[in-house]
Every structure is written in C-alpha cells, then in structure tokens.
C-alpha cells in the first residue's frame, strides 16, 4: 500500500480516467505504457487526461496484453493506491474479448472458401454458415432472448452442442457490429478465403537505391500475417507518417502472395503506390491496374480510390463500383489511411469478412466516431509504435511543434465579434495578420523544403502571390501537380503552397518545415497527415508551425489538434506573436 503521495506520474480515478503529471520524473515511460490501453482526452500544460474505454482495452487484448499487464502498469506508475474497483473492471472488460468466438461450422468447411458468392442466389438453409461459440450459459441466454439478433443468429443444429449459434457467412460483419454494440466483441477465428495466386518478392536494390526492412516494419508484418493461423490475417497497423507504412503493405502482399486490392485516398496516392511497387518489388508493370475516375483496369494488383468506390449517380442509387469489390477473388484488401475509410465502404467490407484485410494508418482516431466499425470490420489493432521511439532511433526526423497565436486587427475583430458562429471560423482562419508571420517564418527557413498548408482557396492564392510560390489545389491538373511535386523532391522548388490535397499519401521526403495557416476544424487526422509530411528521416530537424488567431474559435480547434501531437509524444510550445 502506498501510505503517502510519491513522485509517480499517474493519478488513476474511479471513473476510469487517468491524470498524467507531465512534470513527474517518469512521465515519458508512463505515457508510453498508458498509450497501449487508454486514449488521451485532454492535454493542458501540466496534467493530461487519459480515459480507459472498453474499446481501448479490447484493442490491447487483441494486441496480446492481458488484464494483469494493464493493472500492473497502473500500479507501477500510480501516485496513490488504485481505486478498489479498477482491477475488477479491467479484468471483466478484457474477459469479454474472447467470450464469443466465431469458427467454421463443421458442415461448412468447404463452403467457407466461397465467401464472395452472392447469398441472394441461395436459400438461407443452403447459404454457407459459421458457428458462434459461446461457453457462458448466461450470455447464451442473453443472446437467445435478444430479438434484434434473431434475424442473424439461430441456435446451432450441429454436433458442436449447446451454447452455439449459427449464422450465414454473409452476415459475419453485421453480427460482429451488433454484438459489439451490446458490449461483446467477437474473436473471429473462422476461415479466410484464399485468393488467386499472385507471388511477388521484395527487391532491395543496390548502391544508392539499396534499402532494407526496418525491425518495426518486419514486426508489424509478422503481427498481421500471424503464420496464417486462425484469428490472424486481419487488423490495423498503426505507424507514423513517414515511417514506411507502404513498405509494410508491400511486405504483407509478398508474405501472402495473392491478388490484392489496395484502396487509398486519391489519384496521387494511387500513382505513388504504383511507383513504390515497381521500385521495391519484382512485380511486372502489366500486373498492376488502376481503378479511378479516369482509368478502370482490374489486374491481379489493383489500386483504387475511396472516391470511385463511393461514387453513385444520386443519393437513391446503388454504388455501381462496389460490384468490382464483390466480384473479384481478392486474397488481400489493403485500406490505406484506414481512419478515412468512408462509411459506405463499411457496407462492402462487412460482406467481405472472409478476405484478409489490412488497415494502415497513423491514428485510430476517426472524426466521425466510427472507431468501433474499424475494430469490427477491418480488425483490431495488431501493432503500433510511438512516434518518439522511431524518432530516437533516427527512423523519422525530430520535429519541433509550435502553435503561434496571432492577434486580429481592429476591423477583423469587429467583423468576428458580430459574425455567426460558422462565419467566425473562416474569419479567424483568414486573419490577414497571419501573412507577416508566414512570411517571417519562410524567410527564417529560407533554403529548406517548406510547405504552406491551408483550407481555403482564396487564402492560399493570396499566400502563393505573397511568397512567390507555386500553388497546388484540387483543381490543379494531375500532370502539373505531379511535375511540381517532382520539382520539390529534386530541390528545384523549395516552397509550395498546398491545399488539403497534400494531406494524404504524398511522398515529399525533403520537406522539413510545415506552416499551417488554416485547417479542418481541429481534425486530429489532419494533424497526423500534415506533421507526417515533414517526418521523413533527414539531416536537419523538422519544424511544424500552426498559425492560430488569438481569442478565437481557432484556439479551441488547436487544442484538439495539440492533444493528438502530445499523445504521440511531442513537446508542443505555444507562443504569442507580438510585432
């Protein structure tokens, strides 16, 4: 028993919140331990607030942590004795992961290889089926009495015995979501379908082009593939931007050796995946197809955009390109930037639960709150590594994050004061006083690779003229956009002004300074992507500046973004700009 307060950093509270003292001697190691099973909620200057949630504990359980590990971490770093209910709550919550196990039905071992068939062509009795195993008599009765589950689950008629439920294979995803809503995550150990063979090998190059797998990349692939044992082959890998998530995806493709669908954020990312595959694997160019608005070519390795999959003529029509997902015998689906997976795509993924699914992301946070859908339909977190750990080992650049709070002039303050709430957001974002700050920062970092990133086109046009820099927006033709990116990589262009198109999957390894002049209402996703643009390993440190209008809603939004960076381990300074 801890008879008196000590210098440990955690204060664990009975409501499952944890206060973390940033000034305590073991703050950093406590933060890393806590990040494996809790979520950061608030990050003021002295005390950070984390929360332990059922989903955070289930992700921890899926990654191999047990309740004893969680409680031991809390006890080790806690300043006071744990509230007496905490060990019980942790144990009870984590025990729910695995209480329900999805397995192949004995009579459907062969049929389970046929997951892509349209269930509408069969009767309910003939459709491939799975067994939901439940060894808890009370939970079994709870499921039996739940009329809402009756449309998908029926008492099993197999020899497996009492306590099991039968379900159609096509309902696999839906049942996982419905039971998670009721507080019971399913451990899915049912068979995964084998796709058509597509063997590829990594090509490590020679001389200046030589490269090798980093230890954490190899660990990530092993954690996903899992020796192809039951319960492996699906899930999410969480790695920082700039740490080589694309290489992890390609290594997973090589390990599985089957036809692969890669879904990513935009056409530029499609092209980048193609270039990486051709540079780092032995795949023949003709084996790679693009499925976008401009080109629709399905090959053994097909790269598509989220936009094309969610396109439909009108809101009452079906999504015509979903048929491509259902029809092809994919052995692996890779969802790049999985935190951006559009809600309509979840519907298709729910029907493809027999296909291996790999999610790649820098953050599990979704702005729409659908983290539970990712957990159910893509899979639990299989591997993650803190940004700061990779930074210390030199795998990504050391970054300095600074929020600069800038006053508004009298005219802008008056306009802001009388504006409606929505208008306040844009007025604060387009504060003209930010221009001198951006110009000063650009001059200070002259000669370095600088990205000025913003939300509003009119504002970006003004900054491009002020800085004498090229502007890239969604309206920039693809060939012009690619030419400017190439010039930046070659060092011929040292400063780019870019809109949100630069947030996702663009490889600009020489960028070392990012100046954010406006953003997406405090999006933590966006902060991860923007910081990631400057985190590629390089000789000099990287700098991330966020320009915020003082005494405005932008300060509130900045708090949301700041929380994400602190969660990842970055020291975050706040400075007030006075001319």
Residue spans of the language-model regions?
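Walker A/P-loop
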Residues: 230-252
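Conserved helicase ATPase core of P-loop NTP-dependent helicases/translocases
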Residues: 271, 287-290, 451, 458-462, ...
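Conserved interdomain hinge at the start of the Helicase C-terminal
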Residues: 416-455, 461-462
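Post-DEXD/H (motif II) to motif III coupling segment of the RecA-like Helicase ATP-binding lobe
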Residues: 332, 339-400, 565
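Conserved SF2 helicase motif VI
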Residues: 364, 521-544
